[in-house]
Amino acid sequence: MRFLKKRGAVGIGTLIVFIAMVLVAAVAAAVLINTSGYLQQKSQSTGRQTTEEVASGIKVTSIVGYAPYDDSNKVYKPISKLAIYVSPNAGSAGIDMKKVRVILSDGSIEAVLKYDNSDADSDGTLDKDVFAVGMPDNVFEDDTGTTAYDGDQYITWSELNDKTFGIIVVQDSDGSLKPLTPTLNKGDIAIIAVRVGNYYVDSNGNLQAYSPTPDGVFGEGIKPNTHITGQVVPEHGAPGVIDFTTPSTYTQSVMELQ
């Protein structure tokens, strides 16, 4: 009988150990399930962010430059204006143009420009004429430094300087590109207007300097045989690339550079 009692005691002890092991396993399983759930959600979030970062971005489709013609001396001056055509990458989310930065360098100067959407008196209109909608006869039309459009929105090139760029809307089916809140969406095309020099030609064909004279990005402008590099950098996603060399001589005012 004593032997049987010992066997019963051993059986109860084994049962207690077994129950304890089951409880420990249950706790461990719960921890693993919670951890795996957290990691799954974290990986999904990271995946979405990575996909957005890779898919999002802005691309530079072309760059056109303008060199004013000095009729009195029969010579083209350095390039004074750049029209940088941009659109969003395929699959990109909306790009807030207020947060886009344009970086330009000629090897000696590096400038960083932003869109000036200031509205000091809060009347719902821009303080400067740096936004335009529609297709003009000439993007670089320049009687008084102004590109005119139908309506009351137009670009005044003289109000751009070495720290700001303007926006000319070429295509915007959903109306997302607005003066104070310009957002570049799928299918949109816009021109980033950059004044890189200080001269223009008036309606009489005479060479004029902007007055008062706010500096262009590269002073007098971009001279022949100059290598320009840079980027159009959105808040999120891949930047658009700027990389071109100007012709060795200028033989016309409007020229495609990239």
Swiss-Prot record:
One of the GO BP terms on file: archaeal or bacterial-type flagellum-dependent cell motility
Q: Tell me which stretches of the chain form a coiled coil.
A: none
Domain of life of the organism in this record? Answer: Archaea
Q: GO CC annotations?
A: archaeal-type flagellum
GO function terms (MF aspect): structural molecule activity
Q: Where in the cell is it found?
A: Archaeal flagellum
| Propeptide positions | 1-8
Q: Which UniProt keywords apply?
A: Archaeal flagellum
Functional note: Flagellin is the subunit protein which polymerizes to form the filaments of archaeal flagella.
Question: Which NCBIfam families does the UniProt entry name for this protein?
Answer: arch_flag_Nterm (TIGR02537), PRK08541.1 (NF006325)
UniProt family annotation: Belongs to the archaeal flagellin family.
Protein name listed in UniProt: Flagellin B3
Organism, by scientific name, is Thermococcus kodakarensis (strain ATCC BAA-918 / JCM 12380 / KOD1)
